[in-house]
C-alpha cells in the first residue's frame, strides 16, 4: 500500500476504475465510463469507513505501532548492506580527466579500510587502452597508496584497473582517462542500401493498422496527470507495442516526449513529473507484452524466451530482434501523432525521444529515421561501433565481436554477421541526424565504453550538447539526470 499516496490524495477525490476504450474515442472523463457512484458504473467515492481506516493507519505509522521491513520478509526496520569497508580509488592528475596523445597520465591509487590507508595492501593492476590492457603487474602498497603512470599515442581512453586482495577477498577500483577524445573516430562501415532498407521496413510496418487501445489507470493518476496503459500494432497483425502514457488533465495541444528503454525486461511506470511540466509522455516497452505486470513475470521471460534477445537473428538483417524494436519506436510516434484523448493532443512540431544504454541507441535510430523528431537525448548509448573490436578498438555493448574472457577480438568472426550488424549500428544512425541532441556518459563505464560513446558523438550531425560525467560508470548521478531533463524541456518549449 502506498501510504504517501494516501496522504496526498484528497479525501473527497473521486477515484476511477479501469475501463478500456480505443484512442480517439474519448469521453468527458478519462475512462470513458458513465458517471455514477457504484463501481459497476465506473466511479465510486470512498465511504466513511474507508476514510477512518486510512486515518487510523497514518496514526499507527506515526506512533511506530506499524512498521515495514526495508528488505527481507520479517517485521521491523532492518539495516541494509551498502558498499564495502575496503575501498580502492584510482584518480587521475588532471581534474577534467583529459589528456593529449603522448602525454603522461599519472594515476594515484589508494586502498583504504574504514576510510584510512591500508598498509601492506596487495594489489594487481592492469592498464592500457580500454578493453585491451597492455600491462599487468602485482605489487604491495606499503603505505596503502602509490602512483602509476602510463600514456597513449592515439585518441581513445586509457584505463587503469586495480584489484586489492585483502583477507581472501578482492576489491576493485578503476579510472579511464580521455586521450584527445575529440579526435576519436568510429570504425563502423555503412551498407550502401542502409537508407533503402529502413525506408522499406517502416513502409511495410505501416501496412498494419495501429488499432490503438487505451486503459485508464486511476491508481497512477493525479489531479494534474492522467495515466494510461496503452498498446498499438507494430509491424504485423498481433505484434503490439505496450506503453505507459501520461497526459495533462487540462485539454490542449502539448509537446511530446518518447521514452525508449534500456536493455532488459521489466514493467514501466511512465513519467508523471515530466508530464506535469506540460508535456505528453509515452514510455514504451519493446517486447510486445503488457508493461504493468509484477516483476516476477518479466524475470521469467528474461531467463527463458527473451534471454539474450540482443543476439537473436544476427545472421539476417530481417531477422534481427531490433528490427521490430526500431519499427515499434516509429509506430510509437505514429500513435502520438494520432492521439486525441479528452481534448489532449500533440502540438505537431515539438517531439523528443530519449533513453539510456540500449535506449540511447534507440534514440539515435528513431531520430535518424523519423523527421517528426525535433530533438533527442542519448545517454551512454549502447550498440555503437560493433566492429571496432576487429581493429582492437573498444566496441559498444553487447560486444558482438569481442572475447571478454581473453580480452581480445573473437577468433574468426562470421563476415556475414559483421555485415548484417551494420544495419543496427548506432554510429550509422548518428551520422544521419540533423536535429539538436544531448549526449552524456561516464568515462568509467565498463558496459558502454566511452570510446564508443565519444566517437558516436563526434560523428553525429546537427547541433549537439556534450556533458560527460567522468566518474560515472553505467549509471548516472542526480545532477546528470536533472541536467538531461532540463535540456529536453528547454528544447520542447522553444517553439510553443
What label would you give each PLM region?
Residues 360-412, 468, 476-479:
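Hydrolase active-site cap/lid region
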Residues 71-72:
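Glycine-biased, low-complexity coil/linker segments
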Residues 266-327, 339, 388-391, 395:
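Cap/lid segment of the alpha/beta-hydrolase catalytic domain
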Residues 343-356:
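Alpha/beta-hydrolase fold nucleophile elbow
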Residues 93-97, 206-251:
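N-terminal cap/lid segment of alpha/beta-hydrolase-fold proteins
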Residues 433, 439-441:
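Short beta-strand/loop motif that positions the catalytic acidic residue
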Residues 243-245, 253-263:
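Short beta-strand element of the alpha/beta-hydrolase
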Residues 447-450, 454-496:
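C-terminal catalytic histidine-bearing segment of alpha/beta-hydrolase fold enzymes
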Amino acid at each position: 500500500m502506498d501510504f504517501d499516496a494516501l496522504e496526498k490524495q484528497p479525501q473527497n477525490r473521486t477515484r476511477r476504475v479501469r475501463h478500456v476504450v480505443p484512442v480517439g474515442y474519448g469521453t468527458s472523463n478519462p475512462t470513458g465510463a458513465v458517471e455514477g457512484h457504484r463501481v459497476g458504473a465506473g466511479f465510486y467515492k470512498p465511504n466513511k469507513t474507508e476514510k477512518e481506516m486510512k486515518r487510523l493507519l497514518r496514526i499507527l505509522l506515526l506512533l511506530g505501532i506499524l512498521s515495514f521491513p526495508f528488505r527481507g520478509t520479517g517485521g521491523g526496520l532492518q539495516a541494509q548492506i551498502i558498499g564495502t569497508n575496503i575501498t580502492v580509488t584510482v584518480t587521475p592528475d588532471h581534474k577534467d580527466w583529459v589528456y593529449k596523445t603522448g602525454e603522461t597520465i599519472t594515476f594515484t591509487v589508494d586502498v583504504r579500510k574504514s576510510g584510512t590507508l591500508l598498509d601492506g595492501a596487495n594489489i594487481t593492476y592492469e592498464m592500457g587502452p580500454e578493453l585491451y590492457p597492455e600491462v599487468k603487474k602485482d605489487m604491495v602498497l606499503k603505505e596503502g597508496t602509490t602512483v602509476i603512470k602510463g600514456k597513449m599515442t592515439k585518441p581513445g581512453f586509457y584505463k587503469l584497473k586495480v584489484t586489492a586482495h585483502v583477507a581472501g577477498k578482492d576489491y576493485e577500483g578503476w579510472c579511464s582517462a580521455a586521450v584527445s577524445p575529440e579526435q576519436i573516430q568510429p570504425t563502423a562501415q555503412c551498407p550502401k542500401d542502409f537508407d533503402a532498407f529502413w525506408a522499406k521496413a517502416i513502409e511495410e510496418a505501416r501496412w498494419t493498422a495501429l488499432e490503438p487501445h487505451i486503459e485508464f489507470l486511476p491508481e497512477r493518476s493525479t489531479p494534474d496527470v492522467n495515466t494510461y496503459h496503452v498498446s498499438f500494432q507494430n509491424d504485423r497483425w498481433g505484434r503490439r507495442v505496450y506503453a505507459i502514457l501520461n497526459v495533462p488533465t487540462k485539454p490542449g495541444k502539448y509537446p511530446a516526449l518518447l521514452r525508449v528503454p534500456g536493455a532488459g525486461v521489466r514493467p514501466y511506470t511512465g513519467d508523471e513529473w515530466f508530464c506535469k511540466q506540460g508535456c505528453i509522455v509515452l514510455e514504451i516497452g519493446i517486447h510486445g507484452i503488457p508493461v504493468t505486470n509484477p516483476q516476477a513475470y518479466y524475470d521469467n521471460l528474461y531467463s527463458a524466451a527473451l534471454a539474450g534477445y540482443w543476439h537473436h537473428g544476427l545472421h539476417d538483417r530481417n531477422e534481427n530482434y531490433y528490427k521490430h524494436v526500431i519499427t515499434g519506436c516509429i509506430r510509437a510516434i505514429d500513435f502520438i501523432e494520432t492521439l486525441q484523448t479528452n481534448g489532449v493532443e500533440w502540438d505537431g512540431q515539438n517531439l523528443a525521444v530519449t533513453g539510456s544504454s540500449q535506449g540511447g541507441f534507440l534514440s539515435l535510430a528513431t531520430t535518424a529515421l523519423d523527421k517528426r523528431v525535433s530533438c533527442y537525448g542519448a545517454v551512454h548509448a549502447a550498440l555503437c561501433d560493433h566492429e571496432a573490436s576487429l581493429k582492437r578498438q573498444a566496441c559498444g555493448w553487447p560486444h558482438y565481436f569481442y572475447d571478454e574472457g581473453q580480452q581480445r577480438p573473437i577468433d574468426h568472426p562470421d563476415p556475414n554477421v559483421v555485415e548484417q550488424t551494420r544495419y543496427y549500428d548506432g554510429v550509422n544512425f548518428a551520422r544521419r541526424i540533423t536535429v539538436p541532441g544531448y549526449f552524456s556518459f561516464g568515462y568509467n563505464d565498463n558496459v558502454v565504453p566511452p570510446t564508443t560513446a565519444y566517437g558516436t558523438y563526434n560523428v553525429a550531425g546537427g547541433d549537439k550538447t556534450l556533458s560527460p560525467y567522468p566518474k560515472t560508470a553505467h549509471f548516472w548521478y542526480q545532477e546528470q539526470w536533472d541536467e538531461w531533463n532540463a535540456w529536453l524541456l528547454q528544447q520542447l518549449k522553444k517553439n510553443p
